[in-house]
Design a protein with these regions (language model features):
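N-terminal amphipathic/basic leader segments beginning at the initiator methionine
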Residues: 2-49, 84
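Anionic-ligand anchoring segments at beta-strand to alpha-helix junctions in alpha/beta enzyme folds, i.e.
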Residues: 24-28, 69-113
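Active-site cavity-forming subdomains of large catalytic enzyme subunits
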Residues: 111-206
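Generic structural signal for well-ordered, non-membrane alpha-helical segments
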Residues: 28, 32, 36, 50, ...
Length: 206
């Protein structure tokens, strides 16, 4: 089976240094690409930025789930690191959904599909914009594999940054997490704890 690749990389380097610009040079170099540069000037590009490798930053930031609410801060750090080391960072977003919130409902039908949407959207932006490389920042069940799938499809320099594990909460001096909420629901069904006690765990566990 022939391996799929969305683009073939020419070999062109920056005029100012040795950093390669195999894809962005096609998009922005030359007099005929002035309209493209015009659009990018409007996003904050400078003349100097057009001589730098363009590095996409795929952010999965969302208020949908606590797993991703801090991703925008990590994307800022990634952007800073790229810009300080000779690249031009360009941040874009993709979606995320929460299995933990939608489980047991019709919403679960969208869970696995969302992985494909995430991979497709990252591949679409990176391929269309001509990024020379990209960094994907993810932190939830489906956006992490979605990011990795896009990296494999695009077959260009890329890094995945994991958003980290959610720290446990605390209740009555003990650590509690999402599993404890499920356990509390079970205890309530067995008559071993009240609805108020279940909610007390839910309020602090994540």
């Amino acid at each position: 089976m022939k391996r799929r690749s969305t683009a073939k990389a020419p070999t062109k380097k920056s005029q100012n240094d040795s950093l390669p610009r195999p894809f962005s040079s096609i998009v922005v170099d030359g007099i005929e690409r002035a309209p493209s540069r015009g659009m990018l000037y409007a996003t904050g590009f400078t003349k100097e930025d057009f001589q730098k490798p363009q590095i996409g930053v795929a952010s999965t930031w969302s208020m949908v789930t606590p797993c991703n609410m801090h991703i925008d801060q990590l994307a800022v750090s990634v952007t800073q690191g790229i810009n300080e080391n000779g690249g031009k960072a360009v941040v874009f977003n993709t979606i995320t959904i929460s299995d933990g919130i939608s489980m047991g409902t019709e919403g679960m039908k969208y869970s696995l599909v969302s992985r494909e949407v995430i991979a497709d959207s990252i591949e679409t932006v990176v391929g269309c914009q001509g990024f020379d490389a990209f960094v994907a920042v993810g932190g939830c069940d489906k956006n992490m594999p979605g990011c990795i799938m896009a990296m494999a499809r695009l077959n260009r320099p890329s890094i995945f940054v994991y958003g980290g594990t959610i720290l446990p909460g605390e209740l009555h001096g003990k650590d509690v997490d999402l599993v404890n909420i499920f356990e509390a629901v079970g205890k309530n069904a067995a008559g071993a704890c009240s609805a108020e006690e279940v909610e007390a765990v839910a309020e602090v566990a994540v």
